[in-house]
Amino acid sequence: MRNSLKIIVILLLSLHLGACASTDALQLSNGKGKSFTVSGKNYEQIWRAANVAMSNDMKIVDRHKPSGVIKSRVVNGTPGKIVGFFIQPTDENVPSYTVTIVSQKPLQTDFVDRDWEPSVWEDFKTAINSK
């Protein structure tokens, strides 16, 4: 009986861990997500607004300013869902930047699930326009 309980607990833990999406899966090069062009702002302004947007109902788990990458895990909402925010180029002053937002939830299917997060784009626009 005791061994059965241990096995059940181990199985439940592995199912739970297996259902979490890894932030490593969020890559700009995989063709997923949605891209937007941002003009009239510099890299620092975009970076600050991206951090605000990626902190709203999410916890930032990876951030690398030199490469323009922020990755967050959703706190309120779909458990295990992750979101990536990619800024290109990372030069300080260029005419326009491309912002790509990619999201993935555990056991996501391409047929039903969206691969980006509209609320992050809305939060980003609010943050960048409030400065």
Set out the residue ranges of the language-model regions.
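Bacterial N-terminal signal peptides that target proteins for export
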Residues: M1-I8
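Ser/Thr-rich, low-complexity intrinsically disordered terminal regions
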Residues: A21-K131
